[in-house]
UniProtKB/Swiss-Prot annotation:
It comes from the Bacteria. Residues 185-194 have a biased composition (Pro residues). Keywords: Cell membrane, Lipoprotein, Membrane, Palmitate, Signal. It is a lipid-anchor. Belongs to the MTB12 family. A lipid is attached at residue 27 (N-palmitoyl cysteine). Residues 174-194 are annotated as: Disordered. It is found in: Cell membrane. This is Putative lipoprotein LppK. Residues 1-26 form the signal peptide. The keyword Nucleotidyltransferase does not apply.
Length: 194
């Protein structure tokens, strides 16, 4: 991975930390009770978007870290990784291959993951947020953590995949190459001295 790609990888990770940090702050779950009243619980034209988390339990940490380990593994073809990411298309396979190959080529592998603080998402109640600690092979900055979001596979499967939002930030699926060149830095224009 070239220097700009290395930089882009860490910028994407920083974006995940910032976005997830802002997205998860200030959430509280209150107890709801059922009571009959003459006053409607919602006013006409206003819908409630609050939904209870699923009746199933939170996923085990190793279920989530297995998703990430498989995504980082360059021995698994990108096309076989598509089920690991919500709404991934066959076009995403190239990006997944580039991502895992770049990790390998730049000495990040082996890479291990630990999932902590697993909780239901406050944006999508069926999704979960987890703080993921990443341990990379390089000795400098070898461990870092950031929040990631996971979504359940569509039924009948009982497993999890990386949410589209997290994958977009981490892997830059919006870009056809999967990697972004940073904008060229322009030298400041000298101002004439008087």
């Amino acid at each position: 991975m070239s220097r700009w790609t290395h930089r882009t990888f860490f910028i994407a990770l920083s974006a995940i930390v910032t976005t997830a940090g802002f997205g998860s702050s200030g959430c509280a779950h209150g107890n709801s009770s059922t009571s009959e009243s003459a006053v409607p619980s919602t006013f006409p034209g206003i819908s409630s978007s609050i939904t209870a988390p699923p009746a199933t339990g939170l996923p085990a940490p190793e279920v989530l870290t297995n998703v990430l380990s498989r995504l980082a593994d360059p021995n698994i073809p990108g096309i076989d990784k598509l089920p690991l990411i919500e709404s991934a298309t066959p076009d995403s396979a190239v990006t997944l291959d580039k991502f895992s190959n770049a990790l390998r080529d730049n000495g990040y592998l082996p890479m291990t993951f630990t999932a902590n603080n697993i909780a239901w998402s406050n944006k999508n109640p069926s999704d979960v947020l987890a703080t993921i600690s990443v341990n990379i092979a390089q000795t400098n900055n070898s461990v870092f953590s950031f929040p990631m979001e996971f979504t359940p596979f569509p039924p009948p499967q009982q497993s999890w995949q990386l949410s589209k939002r997290t994958a977009d930030m981490l892997l830059e699926f919006g870009n056809s190459s999967g990697l972004t060149n940073p904008a060229p830095i322009k030298a400041p224009t000298p101002t004439p001295s008087h």
